[in-house]
Amino acid sequence: MPKTLSALVFLVLAVPVSLAAAAAPQAPPSFDEFFVDKALRIDLYQSGDAKSETVTIHRMVEEPVWPESRTGLIPPFDFGRYVFRIYDAASNRLIFSRGFDTMFAEYKTTSPALAGTVRVFERSLRFPEPRRPVLFVIEQRDKRSLLHPVFNQIIDPSDYHILREKASAADWIYEPRIAGDPREKVDFVFLAEGYAAGDRDKFKADVDRMTGALFGVEPYKSMKDSFNVRAVFRASAERGMDEPRQRSYKSTALGASFNAFDLDRYMLLEEDHLMHELAAAVPYDVLAVLVNSPRYGGGSIGLDYCVTTVDHPSSPQVFVHELGHSFGGLADEYYQSEVSYNDFYPKGIEPLEPNITALLDLEGMSPRDPAYAVKPRIVIGPGEIGAGVAVHSVSEPTINVKIRR
């Protein structure tokens, strides 16, 4: 066989083998090889408008324990409008990733942002403390849900700028339910907002009531042994929260405020760094802020926290609803004409949230259709126009669900 032909045959045979080897799945990263049993929290700022974004690290903080799984370091899905990834700097190997949402991501879709008004928002991100230097990368989804890098920085765990302070001893900790090791359970934490120094017993009772509401519904009811529940109490100078439309402003621990994005019933916190600092007194995976007020309302930032008032008759239902956003990454299944979001779910793009879909083959199909019962899909039934806040066709689950009501 001529040498040229031999070389060609070698390439034809070898290249597919090389490509197959390169495409072979890599073993999951070993926690003990790359991380220590602590957490590293990155407190950052996002600033910009609808067309621009700047990410700045404010500080890095060591937390005393990594409470999450040691095996699910790279999840099979990336919920959220952002994803952050941690690469081992020496080998460039991906060793950790998480999807997340931010208050800034919601702001970018509002009319002020579209008009060019620049605002700054806080966000805290957390991952296991690495043993060696890592590359910290943040990626953002575009309107077609494709990810693009927006920030990267080398982080050295030996950096003396990393804060290693102890949690405040003045905060009171309540543990109504401990089912096991934080590394093996979901650690649910309630935080006090708008409770005066003399309201500690009321906060305890509110935590017990909300815990009962949570484990009174599925899927939490059947999985309650998978959860630890703790609460952290820090007194506020005044009771309640800010209500800007009523010209009412209160000095509180976490700065909760209604009228987020100019929506009267939408309550959020802009003190995300402080919220995570307060939560770090205990192991935490899921955060819920309880606001000492009889007013109806609440809010959430997906994959970060939820917040609700406690003394309205519907407060337990609002809490479970908002938890569906923050913990489950679910979309709203209703439409309000007063919403300030523009093109939050662009037409023709499949939403990231698992409970809504834009798939055209679901349109017009009845849940009673025999073919519907066997059709592969994420949702369990088609709903009305307007699911997920946007004003165009999006299929959604059935009417009587917590994320709708």
What does each model-identified segment do?
Residues 23-122, 353:
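N-terminal prosegments of processed precursors
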Residues 160-221, 231-241, 260:
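Fold-level signature of zinc-dependent metallopeptidase catalytic domains
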Residues 202, 299-322:
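Short pre-active-site segment immediately N-terminal to the catalytic Zn-binding motif
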Residues 323-339:
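Catalytic Zn2+-binding segment of zinc metalloproteases
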